[in-house]
Structures are given as C-alpha cells and as structure tokens.
Amino acid sequence: MNDSLKAQCIAEFLGTGLFLFFGIGCLSALKVAGASLGLWEICIIWGLGISLAVYLTAGISGAHLNPAITIALWLFACFPGRKVLPYTVAQVAGAFGGALLAYLLYGSLFTEYESAHQMVRGSLESLHLASIFSTYPAAALSVWQAALVEVVITSILMGMIMALTDDGNGVPKGPLAPLLIGILVAVIGASTGPLTGFAMNPARDFGPKLFAWMAGWGDVAMTGGRDIPYFIVPIVAPIIGACAGAAIYRYLIGKNLPCNTCKLDENES
C-alpha cells in the first residue's frame, strides 16, 4: 500500500468513526440516559455528523465513508478498483471504532439500565439496546421487505449524491455539498427510519454489529431474532441500491446534461 492510499484509508477510518460516534452517542443519550429526542432531532444529528465527516475527509479520500458508495463509484464513476477493498476495510474498522468509543463513554449507563430493567444482555429483549449500535427492522416487516426498503433508500441516497457532486449539473458545489448530503440523509431517515433504521451503509451497520456481538449481545446482535440472519440485509441491500442509484443517475440524468450532450455531439461529429 503506497503512502497516498494509506492516507486515504486513514481518512476513511476517521471519517466513518466520527459520524458513528455522533450517531451512536445520540441513540445512547436517548435510550440509556433519558434524553428527550424526537425522530427528526435524531435524524438531524446523524445527518450533521455525516456532513462533518465529509468536511473532514473529502479532500483526502473523497469521503466515501460507505462501502456501497465505494463499489458504486468503482462500477459507474471510474473509481480505481484496487482501492475498493482497502477503503471497505478502513470503513468497517472505523465504524467499529466509533461504536467502541461511544460505548466507552456510555458503558456504565448501559449497565445501570440493564440492572434497573432486569435485562439480560444477549436475550431477545436486549435488542432494545443492541439497536443503539446497528439497525434492525420493525417487527411488522419481513426480512425481504426490509431489504426492499434498504435498496430503495440507498438508491435515492446514491443518485442524489451523484447529482450534488456532479460538476455539470449546475447545482451548488464546494462547501455546500457536504451539508446538503447531510440534509439528504436526515430527510431519508425522517421518512423511513422507523422501518429499518435507514442503514444504507454496510460499514455503518456491520462494524457496530460486530462490536455489539463482542460486547456481550452475542448471536442476537447478528440475527436480530430472525430466522434469516438480519446482518446480511444491511450489507447486500445497500450495495444493490447504490449501484441502482448510480446507474439511474448516470444513464437517465447525467448523460442528458448540457455539458455531456455537447461532448456526445462532438464525438459524433
């Protein structure tokens, strides 16, 4: 690994860890510290956390912070394939680190909450606290319905990210783009969060799930109490969704932008 790629992976690690720390810290404050936070407030904190992480890392790594985005950019936006695996490892490790850091600060409150509610860590009931770290679907949703939700919302996320960062699209760029991406995440979360927790990111979900598994929640953290282990859904569905969103933007929007139309006309002549 050369120095440039190493720096990019470090940036991805730190950026992913940063927004996970903010998000998990927010949910910890809500569930074990008694903070009064509504759905929109939670989504805004997640969104602003992502905006700050993008501001931190965009100049070094491009601020992917999400393996699904990395894979989609590789397939549809000329991102080098040799960087996909290192970026993904860095993102998952960063998400694990963000979860660990938040737990180190809130750990005693977790223990106090479990004692007060006679909750055994690793039981199905303990998913209430495991969901602080990663996402699980609403009880009324099947695994397949949850997968569909994640495909749809990740495709929207990816398509809009490409629109917001496309130099030919005529929308605000530079310092506004990270903030707009954060608002996008908050809007998606506010509209669909109660369904699946709006994972949209394999690293965001699997890294903290792995931490929860190691921290005593065990198999229930991975399965979510479902017959089909739920951890598979936030890995596979966001990748499918991101690729779909990138393809839709590239072939239905991007190629029809004026700058690209001119290039096509020049090539044809």
UniProtKB/Swiss-Prot annotation:
Coiled-coil zones: none
Residue spans crossing the bilayer: 10-30, 42-62, 69-89, 143-163, 179-199, 228-248
One example GO MF annotation: glycerol channel activity
Disruption phenotype: Not required for bacterial microcompartment (BMC) formation upon expression of the 21-gene pdu operon in E.coli (this gene is upstream and on the other strand from the pdu operon).
Gene3D superfamilies: Glycerol uptake facilitator protein
CDD domains on file: MIP
GO CC terms: plasma membrane
Topology class, membrane: Multi-pass membrane protein
Keywords: Cell inner membrane, Cell membrane, Membrane, Repeat, Transmembrane, Transmembrane helix, Transport
Keyword Transport: yes
Extent of motif NPA 1: 66-68
Pfam entry (one): MIP
Keyword check for Transmembrane: yes
PANTHER family xrefs: AQUAPORIN OR AQUAGLYCEROPORIN RELATED (PTHR43829), AQUAPORIN-9 (PTHR43829:SF9)
Domain writeup: Aquaporins contain two tandem repeats each containing three membrane-spanning domains and a pore-forming loop with the signature motif Asn-Pro-Ala (NPA).
Function statement: Probably facilitates diffusion of 1,2-propanediol (1,2-PD) into the cell.
Family to which this protein belongs: Belongs to the MIP/aquaporin (TC 1.A.8) family.
Record-given protein name: Propanediol uptake facilitator PduF
